[in-house]
Swiss-Prot record:
This is S-adenosylmethionine synthase. Transmembrane segments: none annotated. It comes from the Bacteria. NCBIfam families: metK. ATP binds at residues 16, 173-175, 240-241, 249, 255-256, 272, 276. GO terms for biological process: one-carbon metabolic process; S-adenosylmethionine biosynthetic process. K(+) binds at residue 44. PANTHER family: S-ADENOSYLMETHIONINE SYNTHETASE. Pathway: Amino-acid biosynthesis; S-adenosyl-L-methionine biosynthesis; S-adenosyl-L-methionine from L-methionine: step 1/1. The keyword Transferase applies. It catalyses: L-methionine + ATP + H2O = S-adenosyl-L-methionine + phosphate + diphosphate. Keywords: ATP-binding, Cytoplasm, Magnesium, Metal-binding, Nucleotide-binding, One-carbon metabolism, Potassium, Transferase.
């Protein structure tokens, strides 16, 4: 048991420079998967004042007009000449090469396949070595930590009001941060502080911004029961946020990996998601680990669980599967590991088949987090393994 403590997580809007880059990378990935589901894509994007640079390694039968995808993505986010990033005039440089044949030979034909294994799901090897984590907790309905859930909700609301024109002076760049107080049983009891910074037109007053953001965003998103007289609210604490987006800060694919996952509440293996096809276990195995963790908690095997998977490049089977329930499990962790091995195929081809990952579903994950989403249908958020896991409680 620990004393009362605080935990903080942040989120950013779809117009944050790093998220622009993530969305462009995933929009390119989706465009390729739409034409060729077997596309191999590792696409990185950099955005800065007046410039988008797209680099990476791609092997595909698809033809994609990269310039058009880039400009369309920027326009959809809502950037204009006035807000500092004009989709029509921004320079777009593309430097894409083919996937390395040395990597391709290990992905196309795994170590197991080279050793005469005939199982078709053993054919694809992991695209890289590394470890990936998945997490779930029962403190929210979407099995996510409360701080990151609230931070994402604030950003979704901010972007929604901007797109609808309900707060007319908002521009696309924004950030939110939420600090939650936990009691000595580790249950969330209140919101201690909220920080929201929104980019805005130059002719609006700070007082109007603070009034609107608190009333129309913060107070509508955060449950009243979690707010009290001691909750601290900070709206645009610098006093001015006119210059934003790539005009103020350069952005890069994969630089918001904690926002993308659990807000720091769980560990992270270090690999980013956006711009990568599902043979890259950085992405697909992280999705599988979340899928496992969410179903384990939903089945009542634990109140919180962190699942670690690890891979060797060119090898299909994971080199390790590890479970940590933080003392909250209803059964032993060995039983949970057994349940995982018996119910989840964790070879790359098995994950791709299990979660149907050759589809163009990725751009929608590139803002507001990849996990705990209720606004879009993501296969790794499904609870279709709960029934199979219930038998392990006996």
């Amino acid at each position: 048991m620990q004393e009362r403590h605080l935990f903080t997580s942040e989120s950013v809007s779809e117009g944050h420079p790093d998220k622009i880059a993530d969305q462009i990378s995933d929009a390119i990935l989706d465009a390729m998967l739409e034409q060729d589901p077997d596309s191999r894509v590792a696409c990185e994007t950099t955005v800065t004042t007046g410039l988008v640079l797209v680099v990476g390694e791609i092997s595909t039968k698809a033809y994609v007009d990269i310039q058009s995808v880039v400009r369309g993505t920027i326009k959809k986010i809502g950037y204009t000449k006035e807000s500092g990033f004009d989709p029509d005039s921004v320079g777009v440089l593309v430097a894409l090469d083919e996937q390395s044949p040395d990597i391709a030979q290990g992905v196309d034909e795994s170590l197991e396949a080279r050793e005469s294994d005939t199982d078709p799901l053993d054919k694809i090897g992991a695209g890289d070595q590394g470890m990936m984590f998945g997490f779930a907790i029962d403190e929210t309905e979407n099995y996510m930590p409360l701080p990151i859930s609230l931070a994402h909700a604030l950003m979704r609301k901010t972007d929604s009001l901007r797109h609808k024109g309900e707060i007319s002076y908002l521009r696309p760049d924004a950030k939110a941060q939420v600090t939650v107080e936990y009691d000595d049983d580790d249950n969330p009891i209140r919101v201690d502080s909220v920080v929201v910074s929104v980019q805005h037109d130059p002719d609006v007053t700070l007082e109007e911004i603070r009034r609107d953001v608190e009333a129309k965003i913060i107070r509508t998103v955060i449950p009243e029961a979690l707010m009290d007289d001691d909750t601290k609210i900070y709206v645009n604490p610098t006093g001015r946020f006119v210059l934003g987006g790539p005009q103020a800060d350069s952005g890069l694919t994969g630089r918001k990996i904690i926002v993308d996952t659990y807000g720091g509440f769980a560990r992270h293996g270090g690999g980013a998601f956006s711009g990568k096809d599902a043979t890259k276990v950085d992405r697909s195995a992280s999705y599988a680990a979340r899928y496992i963790a969410k179903n384990v908690v939903a089945a009542g095997l634990a109140k919180r669980v962190e699942v670690q998977l690890a891979y060797a490049i060119g090898v299909a089977k994971p080199v390790s599967v590890s479970v940590n329930t933080f003392g909250t499990s209803a059964v032993s962790e060995d039983v949970i590991e057994q349940a995982i091995r018996e119910n989840f195929d964790l070879r790359p081809a098995g994950i791709i088949k299990m979660l149907d990952l050759k589809r163009p579903i990725y751009e929608q994950t590139a803002a507001y987090g990849h996990f705990g989403r209720t606004d879009v249908d993501l296969p790794w958020e499904h609870l279709d393994k709960v029934q199979a896991l219930l038998k392990y409680r006996d």
